[in-house]
Amino acid sequence: MDNLFTFLHEIEDRYARTIFNFHLISCDEIGDIYGLMKERISSEDMFDNIVYNKDIHPAIKKLVYCDIQLTKHIINQNTYPVFNDSSQVKCCHYFDINSDNSNISSRTVEIFEREKSSLVSYIKTTNKKRKVNYGEIKKTVHGGTNANYFSGKKSDEYLSTTVRSNINQPWIKTISKRMRVDIINHSIVTRGKSSILQTIEIIFTNRTCVKIFKDSTMHIILSKDKDEKGCIHMIDKLFYVYYNLFLLFEDIIQNEYFKEVANVVNHVLTATALDEKLFLIKKMAEHDVYGVSNFKIGMFNLTFIKSLDHTVFPSLLDEDSKIKFFKGKKLNIVALRSLEDCINYVTKSENMIEMMKERSTILNSIDIETESVDRLKELLLK
């Protein structure tokens, strides 16, 4: 980890990170984080009864548990704004909301109606304006006019699916779905699977998302703010997430190990100089501290922050290159999966930029109208 941050610091005058995803590999010392969190979230409907430590409340926006039988969101109401009457309701036509109408539940309903949650994304994705049923086309070909075509409603206790078809082309379907959600206090509950993954998610107020899988491996999607400047800010954001995450685990799992790790993490946060932060991170790796010793890069992107004032020559890019140009002159390096990958493509990017500058200078010095076609091809296509 310290070597990655050291290199990112070396190039931060030219490149900035955008997407940054990584994993914390499960290890024996931490126990069954997934199972214990599942048990706590499943049995409670108040945020305070899950997250006891009030010091970390401002950092955590929501907890989500999703498996084949149940999806449950527990929200931290204090992290949401007070809505006015003109605040846009996003999801009324997708859901039937059942609530006990208490003040706490009514506030949760208000938040759910206005937040673009994963439940909204799921139900919008499964609603299909047009879908071709190829099995029914086959019936038409082989069965003639006596073929049976389905349209109508299919439903269970929590999901209603309406299938409509055109009388002239009955194999083309329009599918709409409505989902029932039960809102009690801070909890938003629906039955059945509402995601392709069985995970527990911790959504932070800074938009970072931590996904915990059944083996307690974690996938962390680190958010980025517009005011993030350089590697030191990135380290602070990552270790701020660590600090609050590990205190949450200590809260739920009652494992003193996480409190000890949170204290070590806090030393990185309170250090003011980058060199000191990197030194502490290196020491954590040497002592096999959770969060550093089991850190594994998932994928990250870099963007070239300087302006490209010369002509861009796309022909210099390999077909499978991770260097991409967006909107003509925006250079990004995408899907980097290791420090070695990063060093390799940054080096390629630097060399390519220099080659483009040279070609651009030559191109600007010649008369395009009189120059030979072969010479122009050599500049533009090779």
UniProtKB/Swiss-Prot annotation:
Subunit annotation: Heterodimerizes with protein A8 to form the virus intermediate transcription factor (VITF)-3.
Function (record text): Acts with RNA polymerase to initiate transcription from intermediate gene promoters.
Gene induction: Expressed in the early phase of the viral replicative cycle.
Family from the record: Belongs to the orthopoxvirus OPG150 family.
UniProt keyword list: Activator, Early protein, Phosphoprotein, Transcription, Transcription regulation
Cited InterPro entries: Poxvirus_intermed-TF
Protein name: Intermediate transcription factor 3 large subunit
Biological process according to GO: DNA-templated viral transcription
